[in-house]
């Protein structure tokens, strides 16, 4: 669905199918074309990345594989040091992090609603277990 906004994707593929691609745990949307891939990989923001590591399509399961090591190696370390952390990321990365932190099942994640642009605050124990969460 690279390059399509949600409304255009719904018109082309149907609302239910787009919902499944956007929200399910292990269903990938259609892979991007070589032309689409070349266009966004030409963007200088991606120059530092190994192009072979960039997927043609990605499910939430795939995103989780990328997000959790970053949580473990970086974010959690700052929190364990007593620092406050602000995470600003793409919705699917946030969804993966929420799935991990709240232990949301693969089946339940499809209906999990995340407000766009609204700060979500987590209160955690010293062991980084969720005590509470709320939107500002």
List each language-model region with its residue ranges.
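Terminal low-complexity/intrinsically disordered segments and their adjoining alpha-helical capping regions
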Residues: 1-136
